[in-house]
UniProtKB/Swiss-Prot annotation:
GO biological process: isopentenyl diphosphate biosynthetic process, methylerythritol 4-phosphate pathway; terpenoid biosynthetic process
UniProt xrefs under InterPro entries: Dihydropteroate_synth-like_sf, IspG_bac, IspG_bac-typ, NO2/SO3_Rdtase_4Fe4S_sf
Cofactor details (free text): Binds 1 [4Fe-4S] cluster.
Organism: Tropheryma whipplei (strain Twist) (Whipple's bacillus)
PANTHER family attached to this UniProt entry: 4-HYDROXY-3-METHYLBUT-2-EN-1-YL DIPHOSPHATE SYNTHASE (PTHR30454), 4-HYDROXY-3-METHYLBUT-2-EN-1-YL DIPHOSPHATE SYNTHASE (FERREDOXIN), CHLOROPLASTIC (PTHR30454:SF0)
Assigned protein family: Belongs to the IspG family.
Function: Converts 2C-methyl-D-erythritol 2,4-cyclodiphosphate (ME-2,4cPP) into 1-hydroxy-2-methyl-2-(E)-butenyl 4-diphosphate.
Pathway connected to this protein: Isoprenoid biosynthesis; isopentenyl diphosphate biosynthesis via DXP pathway; isopentenyl diphosphate from 1-deoxy-D-xylulose 5-phosphate: step 5/6
Entry protein name: 4-hydroxy-3-methylbut-2-en-1-yl diphosphate synthase (flavodoxin)
Lineage: Bacteria, Bacillati, Actinomycetota, Actinomycetes, Micrococcales
Membrane-spanning residues: none
């Protein structure tokens, strides 16, 4: 028998994915039913070909799907053909100020070109030629509107880079590209303030079926930037908005990719990977949880399977969390109960907890399907 308590129905956490047109970036697709992709940007001088390709290789190994490279000079533009040819993932050329570099990037075989309508010289007058060359070459465009370089006309109209100002700029440029029958573009409307950024993307999502690239610009150092991007992305992705993401951090680019992938995994938008769940420790803990979690994480960092490992420090939440994991330990009184898929398989001394978990994890990994990416860590 069911009893109606008159409580409101619980909404689904994630709304259906917003329906967008699908565009091609090299060997990957963006929008439509394609997965949400993670993007980053190299921090090397693009003219340093070896260093740039090395960083792209590191990003690829970390799970990056698309990489952007800076093109601030003619020398950078002249080496793009080498970068684009040797990169393992699609390359987007980042162009500001000089329209000639847009054409150079298209000719170089880049998968896409990011154009900034706020600072490229006489940009509106260039769109016809850009659309013609990009269409002929099969190159897509990202219309990258940024609060820090908004069109002066819109700044005069709105007084500051408001959400509506960002959207007006993006919609205007999108309309010009479409007038030339060019539709292979995605749009970003980045702002340093997560609330303004969310407002802008919500407004933009209502205006057309363009794929959207999410980003909080100038997000800040690793901790602050992670919080800002995670907050904004979670809101938008939960509403079905977003087709590619970049977590902008004042940190090595690989860290951007790790955070981006973890945001997607946390929302169930990417396949789960190795996950270490550990308690934050408290006065009840009878073992050094921090040390155990760190040693287990280090010992399993090369595993590439969707395995959940719980490292718990006491008998309050420990047994429950350990039972819910694929593998876990509930510790106390100098020993640990080892759980495998909900069942206690043995009790070992504290000194044997880490070796036992590593042994069991590798055994379980051999029975599981292959996955890819970096391990994730959750503190519960």
């Amino acid at each position: 028998m069911s009893i109606d308590l008159g409580l409101p129905k619980v909404r689904e956490v994630l709304s259906p994915r917003r329906k967008t047109r699908r565009i091609k970036l090299g060997k990957v697709f963006v929008g439509g039913d394609s997965p949400i992709l993670v993007q980053s940007m190299t921090t090397t001088q693009t003219t340093n070909i070896d260093a740039t390709l090395q960083q792209i290789a590191e990003l690829t190994a970390a799970g990056c799907d698309i990489v952007r490279v800076a093109v601030p000079s003619r020398d950078d533009a002249q080496v793009l053909h080498i970068i684009a040819k040797k990169s393992q993932i699609p390359v987007i050329a980042d162009i500001h100020f000089q329209p000639n570099y847009v054409y150079a990037a298209i000719d170089a075989g880049c998968a896409a070109v990011r154009v900034n309508p706020g600072n490229i010289r006489k940009f509106d007058d260039q769109i016809g030629k850009i659309a013609e060359k990009a269409k002929a070459a099969g190159v897509s465009i990202r219309i990258g509107v940024n609060a820090g370089s908004l069109d002066p006309r819109l700044l005069e109209k709105y007084g500051r880079p408001t959400a509506q100002a960002l959207v007006d700029s993006a919609v205007w440029e999108a309309g010009l590209f479409e007038e030339y029958d060019f539709h292979d573009f995605k749009i970003s409307v980045k702002h340093h303030d997560p609330v303004t950024m969310v407002k802008a993307y919500r407004l933009l999502a209502e205006r057309g079926d363009w794929p959207l690239h999410l980003g909080v610009t100038e997000a800040g150092p690793a901790f602050q930037g992670t919080i800002k991007s995670s907050t904004a992305f979670a809101v938008l992705l939960a509403e079905g908005i977003g087709d590619t993401i970049r977590v902008s951090l004042s940190a090595p680019p690989v860290e951007e990719v790790k955070v981006g992938l973890e945001i997607l995994r946390s929302l169930g938008l990417r396949e789960r990977r190795l996950e270490i769940v550990s308690c934050p420790s408290c006065g009840r803990a009878q073992v050094d949880v921090y040390r155990l979690a760190e040693e287990v994480t280090k010992g399993l960092e090369k595993l590439t399977v969707p395995l959940r490992v719980a490292v718990m420090g006491c008998i309050v939440n420990g047994p429950g969390e350990a039972r819910e994991a694929d593998l876990g330990v509930a510790s106390g009184n100098g020993k640990g109960q080892i759980f495998v898929r909900g069942q206690v398989i043995k009790t070992v001394p504290e000194s044997e907890i880490v070796p036992t978990l590593l042994e069991e994890a590798n055994r379980l990994a051999g029975e599981m399907p292959f996955s890819s990416g970096s391990p994730t860590i959750a503190i519960v």
